[in-house]
């Protein structure tokens, strides 16, 4: 996929990054947004703020009265994104904020049909023009630009690292929200795009998780920080197109992980079977039953299932949602809220 409008749903920093805080920094580098009208949102945020030591000045209590599933981009821009960014600026936190963390009971899908050019509206690719809350927050500059849906450009995320011939990033670069990134991902002084990492602590509506499930995950992830538990990162391959198209890149990625002193393995099947050391996972299947695998997800693990509807929490959506990983003990996961670019 060249571009995915995916919902990052993490326990560690989020329900992930805030967990170990390497990618986005420490508690002073994130901004926590809470739906002040939702007891679930407040409960999840309180648990997270306590576990992570979030300063009160880095918390915004926002009374969200709109849908907690989907809203128009105009509503997102005026009633959610702009108030968040204005609060960050008003509190003089902009130089230090790298990540916007949403608690539960905010919309996970942003509908931008009203801003789609007429020439694109007839294309099957844009039949359901939507982006995720976290993806559209990361691309806040494009969303606020007034230049049309420039976020549709597959190259809109310039923080993405270019890959070498083996499919492994050529280099890595610690993220800073005040950095500007050029067309090749290079940090520039006065040109290029700025971004903000963004995650959700959880979704408590529809096919999401319960508040106790989310809080248990937050607690387990916090307890795992810095412990470097022994475990294995698994890459699952089978005849499903979701894995076949990516499996050639698995061996070099496994080697790169092992060069860091972490075990990694390519396994065949739908899920890792009877593995008690799942420290990370990449797989691809429409539906799965994790308990039936008899495998154990370790605290702090990031688990990904590359499929079309994993980030959709509408009860009738179909396909297994990413919340199944959280329920099984994963620290974080992500999923698309609309069919991604292939």
Tell me the role of every PLM-derived stretch.
Residues 1-3:
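N-terminal secretory signal peptides that target proteins for export/translocation
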